[in-house]
């Protein structure tokens, strides 16, 4: 039976407003004011990272703030322009637009639409489990790579030099060759903004650091007429709100953007769900991954229709809202109202923002993406996890942002296959004073039952590990110190099987039979029993050699 979707299922955000409590209002208002002060300069900065005019960042912020408040399942998550998606947008569109700014803007909006459609369709199809497609080590390494690419993309902006190239190493090389032509007033201004942001984060973490730093830089430029001395400013920003419309794009461009859009959708959704779950857990709340897919999809469609670019969750804005007391998505609606007011009535002030200050804001955000504590945690946990994270970082730097995403997904899948293809296994024995049977490697005092091998393979059986299972099971028999008479497979971990695995199981049974060893199975659940029957293995093994528990299997061996 296909489950029906209720209105709360499609719009889970409505529930928080139905259950709204007056005592939450102060925190939500404060969070809305703070996030708006953070969002406005950040959105403008990320628009420049995406290769678009600063105004596009504000356009891309408006509709997603309203839509996510209704459709999202997280009460804390902040949606809008974000560093990774902005950088991926630039990586995808720069080669396609070839310097045509109008075409670039059309492609950016189209990319947002495609990302949204992919997420929306995936959410409708209940593919929320894809949130686990990127493992933690891969995500940590990917974000570190993104951060380094973000910094390299801003080298020209914060130094006033001309930096060529669209990838990390080409940008670093170009900057190295032009470092003698640094425009020192621009560089000093950028470093001052970066220093102020760092100090505010340390000494006043609840303060809206970005807006304070950028406004301070703007006042300095205006008072000292620094724009006349070579410091670039944003320039004219259209006042008012964007007029929604479908971008005029060709079928050829749509085809070219489909695969990049899928890559951006994966990163957007995965990062968003991980962030939402982390903050929801602090308050004992739950996040619906399928609802998140639909919400992020709708937000990106709206961003595309309002001449923006792909949007995602922002962990920094989410954390800021949480720390100042935000309890529901009302804070996003308040932030939305402030963004609209600024766009309508204060576009002249935005025009005076120094480009170098926005670049410093991007560098500051990038530095916060490099989580050294997570790298240290990976190193302490398992060396292979650390190497996986470093390999992902190297893939992003060497292959570029988009192909780095594909490499990240591939590395996650390969790591999963490696674990499935060669999982832990164990021979079980009895431990004095402890009920049940346990791994003899974990308990040196464990005693085997002479003539009986009880074997457990700790993974679902499938094509990826079928041969590994058969080979290791026979190795256990060969290494047994006594004469093996029975082999009992503890199937508690083997509920999921495919035909390749059952063929390997039958080959194992046949080989053991040839050696005069009885093959039996214990802890066989009903689903596995049905699979054995469908593959005609149940009769071959024999109902009298299929046991519900390990003790009954051992008793049967002793009564043989």
From Swiss-Prot:
GO terms for cellular component: plasma membrane. InterPro entries: SLC26A/SulP_dom (IPR011547), SLC26A/SulP_fam (IPR001902), STAS_dom (IPR002645), STAS_dom_sf (IPR036513). It is a multi-pass membrane protein. Signal peptide: none annotated. The keyword Lipoprotein does not apply. Pfam families: STAS (PF01740), Sulfate_transp (PF00916). It is found in: Cell membrane. It comes from the Bacteria. The chain crosses the membrane at residues 29-49, 51-71, 79-99, 105-125, 138-158, 184-204, 207-227, 256-276, 333-353, 355-375, 394-414. Keywords: Cell membrane, Membrane, Sulfate transport, Transmembrane, Transmembrane helix, Transport. Residues 442-557 form the STAS domain. GO terms for biological process: transmembrane transport. Belongs to the SLC26A/SulP transporter (TC 2.A.53) family. NCBIfam families: sulP (TIGR00815). This is Probable sulfate transporter MT1781.
